[in-house]
Design a protein with these regions (language model features):
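C-type cytochrome heme c attachment motif
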Residues: 42-53, 103-112, 124-127
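Post-cleavage N-terminal segment of exported redox proteins
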Residues: 1-31, 158
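Short, conserved charged micro-motifs
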Residues: 67, 115-122
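Structured domain cores in non-transmembrane regions
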Residues: 62-110
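Short loop/turn segments at secondary-structure transitions that flank enzyme active sites
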Residues: 57, 113, 158
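Extracytoplasmic/lumenal ectodomains and periplasmic regions of secretory and membrane proteins
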Residues: 124-158
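Short strand-loop junctions, especially beta-strand C-caps/beta-turns
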Residues: 27, 110-112, 155
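Electrostatic cytochrome c docking/interface patches
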Residues: 18-42, 53-64, 72
Length: 158
């Protein structure tokens, strides 16, 4: 479970599609850094769970990184969900497809699905988040070296 939560620390926003042979950066191992895992969970809740679900993950598993039910409710849950519920979103997939061209994928198993001969899924996620670049030819104004022609903008850009 700690590995899944560590990956959440690295997944503040993702839309994945076809694979890539882009060389992967080595992701830092944060599996034993509870503060980093808690920050990652907060980033994931604030940035990713607006469009992406994590239906194989329940809010109460955040206890594994030292959060209380009260902290989970106050800082990571923004709907009427219960702490034992799965991490769903209210956006209808049909609306998402209309707005974005495709429904954003569920992120709960994305690290497993992105493991390849190039490296573990955590390395793909880490590389993906770090390789956005401006591309005025794209509808969002952004593209990605690890996932060319990505449909999602660089949501961590500030």
């Amino acid at each position: 479970m700690k590995k899944i939560l560590a990956l959440l620390a690295l997944v503040p926003s993702l839309v994945f599609g076809a694979g890539s042979n882009y060389p992967l950066d080595k992701a830092p191992d944060l599996t034993n850094d509870l503060a980093a895992l808690q920050r990652g969970a907060k980033l994931f809740s604030n940035y990713c769970l607006n469009c992406h679900s994590a239906e194989s993950m329940r809010y109460n598993r955040l206890r594994d990184i030292g959060l209380t039910d009260e902290q989970i409710k106050e800082n990571l849950m923004f709907a009427t969900d219960n702490v034992g519920d799965t991490m769903n979103i209210s956006m209808d997939p049909k609306d998402a497809k209309k707005w974005f061209g495709a429904a954003p994928p569920d992120l709960s198993l994305i690290a497993r699905s992105r493991a390849s001969a190039n490296g573990p899924g955590a390395d793909y996620i880490y590389t993906y988040l770090r390789t956005y670049y401006r591309d005025p030819s794209k509808p969002t104004g952004w593209n990605n070296m690890a996932f060319p022609n990505v449909g999602m903008p660089h949501v961590l850009w500030e």
